[in-house]
């Protein structure tokens, strides 16, 4: 989502609260819970899941392996649910022509760097750069080159913008900031 006026451009960045992340976390949780229940059923010799009789899966080695996969899956699933609840990667980009300042804010993981806040002067922006890598997994990323600081990505690598969309976005931003566009 973007909000623009004559002097300010604010672009909201979606973090980890995407539908695909919710789906993967849910599927992984259910699958790993199933694996753990099958492993536990084979250990106890009781039927905790009604799909099969417990005698069909021997605890050593199948039950141990399934329990291990279930526990590992629950750890990965809990990691995904934590990133979703913390909304890691979300934030905003604010370009203020009137004040001459660019502010980039992102939420990170809890701890010392939970809030990532970068502030630059607009006069230090050298260019807006588009990096294109074609192939099976095409990647188009928009960067802002800052004098003495390097490049700062403005779009996610998994955003999958079409060439026309990334060019449009780069052209509008470069025009707003009055800086050149570079393509790599």
UniProtKB/Swiss-Prot annotation:
It is a multi-pass membrane protein. InterPro entries: PSI_Ycf4_assembly. The keyword Amino-acid biosynthesis does not apply. Keywords: Chloroplast, Membrane, Photosynthesis, Plastid, Thylakoid, Transmembrane, Transmembrane helix. The chain crosses the membrane at residues 19-39, 57-77. One of its GO terms (cellular component) is photosystem I. It is found in: Plastid, Chloroplast thylakoid membrane. Pfam families: Ycf4 (PF02392). GO terms for biological process: photosynthesis. Belongs to the Ycf4 family. Seems to be required for the assembly of the photosystem I complex. HAMAP family: Ycf4. This is Photosystem I assembly protein Ycf4. It comes from Nicotiana tomentosiformis (Tobacco). The gene is ycf4.
